[in-house]
């Protein structure tokens, strides 16, 4: 089947993601889309480990999707670029980074569970980037599936204004199809079409007519309110045309005022084609979303706007780096404006480095179709970029722009890694460098005292998979320590006028620097955790030495004052100082900056912070007491309890350090009937008794 070329008419292009809770059926849904749009000949099943989008070995083994592959497909002469995003909480970085470059998304929900904790988190991330969404209630064939319950959870838990545009025909084992509330017809999949490629459009079954009328009225009321003319027509008792209704739903969806809800069962091949129609009908094209906004390199207050047109200068955002077995480094980019040919030279305006675009591809999971030109509104994979990492902007060398990047959370869990042999040591550093390029939430540092390499990530599964990839892809044999919590330190009070003088006179040129600072607790509006301000006047410290004091202070913050954990949330104000004509140097002021910070922080009531997780346990009522007792014994704070489809749900905030091995304990306490999910919530101060233990362990006392 010949691949069609990239469509130049951007009104027919959709860049979408499929987002959901871990088991709601995202990958299966994506597989079906690829099948119906004619790219896959055999439907890949996650259960067989044959899904096309899951291209790493670990993904196929674990049946979950870790890296978002970008895939292009065609539906009724429209082009859909899909980014498959993982739903497991440890992979938030993948979700964040794909939402940044999407224009719209399909949120998939489990028809039995409705909105789950992870779906809530992903939904909030999509809110952050203003991504328009349509909702697909999947797994309608599952026992206990309830479309109306799922819709209710969207309203209650997400606070979303949802408009059902379909209703299910039958449910559980008898799920046959959907009622289309726009066309007021039923679409029913016959039993003989095994792969669901054809469905029949029939009249609405009599037993559903009343419900259909009720929901149709709700839909029409929402639609009529979008436009004066429609409202008059509707109130005057005239029928609205199908085109008018679709146009109004599209308007509501693109402005994120409402979210259309559809239903189906991807696994049983029912309801996927109407969902594809809805992607085209209601989700925005690159022309419907606001133009890309950035700034001139080095001048953050000079705003630049780029419209999604090939006549504008070229600009693109790199949103993912992956290692490909043959091509080496693949960089996925979203082109926001202009066009560029393969082989052209562009500039990485974030880093100010020249880059050459080698080959350009439109990707289909992990098969590639080469293209000659990359143009606005599309997503491509590029080979040949050397210095570009996630979040960097590529632009036309003569018209530079830096686009807004992405924010990634700090790791909450760490493990120490020791290579087994000398050759493993070399392979280890190479593999770490490669993996860190791909995944910005994967952090590495050397433990000063033990000399071990410590890697940090977003959760145990995240680190497991990274270590597993080191073994498989880079053949590194290493011993992996027990997971450790990534603690931090901070200060609680203001300390004024702390001074330190660094001087050395031992023949030859000496060193001299005197600084006076105050430090105070600080949190920036944008989440910044450090600020430096100089109030030095009258040249008491020459201007060129002031940045050295800042650099020295930041160095000292890497290893805090209590137990060697990074210091965060503080502001340093340089008040005064003194220098010596001959003996002062940048180095001397850097040392003074470092020492004065340690001295000041030690006096500012330093405390240790630990990551607190938002934990949600779903348990049968019989075990409710045990579950709550256990969470309390783990220093947990119960936030809420609610009933959900016959089970009890306990929500609590629990320190990560107390959650290791929780999965086994929970199973044994509830005979395997309870399950839980946890996501990082915030950092909070550690109680005094725990703090003593942490310090004693760190200082080896």
From Swiss-Prot:
Residues 11-287 form the tr-type G domain. Coiled coil: none annotated. InterPro entries: EFG_II (IPR041095), EFG_III (IPR009022), EFG_III/V (IPR035647), EFG_IV (IPR047872), EFG_V (IPR035649), EFG_V-like (IPR000640), EFTu-like_2 (IPR004161), G_TR_CS (IPR031157). GO terms for molecular function: GTP binding; GTPase activity; translation elongation factor activity. Keywords: Cytoplasm, Elongation factor, GTP-binding, Nucleotide-binding, Protein biosynthesis. One of its GO terms (biological process) is ribosome disassembly. The keyword Protein biosynthesis applies. The lineage of its organism: Bacteria, Bacillati, Actinomycetota, Actinomycetes, Mycobacteriales. One of its GO terms (cellular component) is cytoplasm. Belongs to the TRAFAC class translation factor GTPase superfamily. Classic translation factor GTPase family. EF-G/EF-2 subfamily. It is found in: Cytoplasm. The keyword Protein biosynthesis applies. Signal peptide: none annotated. Pfam families: EFG_C, EFG_III, EFG_IV, GTP_EFTU, GTP_EFTU_D2. GTP binds at residues 20-27, 84-88, 138-141. Catalyzes the GTP-dependent ribosomal translocation step during translation elongation. During this step, the ribosome changes from the pre-translocational (PRE) to the post-translocational (POST) state as the newly formed A-site-bound peptidyl-tRNA and P-site-bound deacylated tRNA move to the P and E sites, respectively. Catalyzes the coordinated movement of the two tRNA molecules, the mRNA and conformational changes in the ribosome. This is Elongation factor G.
